[in-house]
């Protein structure tokens, strides 16, 4: 049996509060606080409510369906998949306000520790590139060969032919992956933007795509890193370089 069983879905009027620890807005519903995807603090929305049962426990999540009172910081999300794949949470929020929300979230977390309450939090360093920066993608593969993402709330599979966050090389590889029907349900694609090195796992046995590499190499500020397939590596290479330069300065 699927670990996550959908019980029912409905619609409700919600008044959105703060951003929660998972990145979604928080709203009160039936006496409890729930996460609502696609909102901005202060908005009044009609949301689609999803009730789930997981391991004998009940959970409730929501997705904005209609905005009644819109925030001044709301913008049109540039990605056609936004809201369906749920990989991006804040494309509907003006970028400058995104940075303010991130800073506020860090301050809120620090307040939970007496030893960190007085620590001064600097403004968030804006990314030089809001799109085409990710050096790592993990795609889901359906039996019919379609490649894409799974909506984290509805668990519905969303076929994707282009992801605005990924480097052009990863998107080119994504196009090649469509409909080759590999014998796997997950594919990991990684790319070194400063070296041109790449990794596709698992081995696909397809001549058009080099795959099965155990690692790839990336250059950060003159330092070569050997990144294994399961290893963590900062997905925004340019920001990682800027961070290392700040630490060393």
Each model region followed by its residue ranges:
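Accessory RNA-recognition modules of RNA-modification enzymes
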Residues: 1-249
